Amino acid sequence: MSLEGNKVGWVGTGNMGSPMSHCLIGDGASVAVFDPAADNMSAAVSAGARAGSSNHDVAADAEFVFSMIPDDDVLRAVALGDGGVLSAMSPGSVYVDMSTVSPEVSGEVAAAADAAGIGYLRAPVSGSTILAEAGNLTIMASGPEDAYGRCEPLFE
């Protein structure tokens, strides 16, 4: 399936995020990536992604922003902090966090996204890096139905 024309921001290109972003690049999406560990971005950039300079940078022009990050504190910083993705995203865009985080912090992000007119999906994954490389992770998404419908082609 071609994802050509889809503008995606991706935050977190570690062991799982990097191969997940590669799948979108391989299917034709225009992907900008950011990771505070700059070395983590090299594989995605080699695959065709644009290296972003910050969370805000990769979210500024994206219709969809994905994050795959380690914990609650990082989610707060990425989504809600100074220069966070929600401050850069346009109303009508969709933020998808694919990390395993607490319901409380995810709820904080959901409330802020809703107030900004941004769809927010909680979409943790099940599977290994091998499955991520093959594009065969199980995604357990919840959130607004319209946001899910728009993201479904990207999940496949």
Residue ranges and their predicted role:
Residues 25, 42-46, 76, 110-114, ...:
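Class I S-adenosyl-L-methionine
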Residues 55-119:
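Rossmann-fold NAD(P) dinucleotide-binding segment
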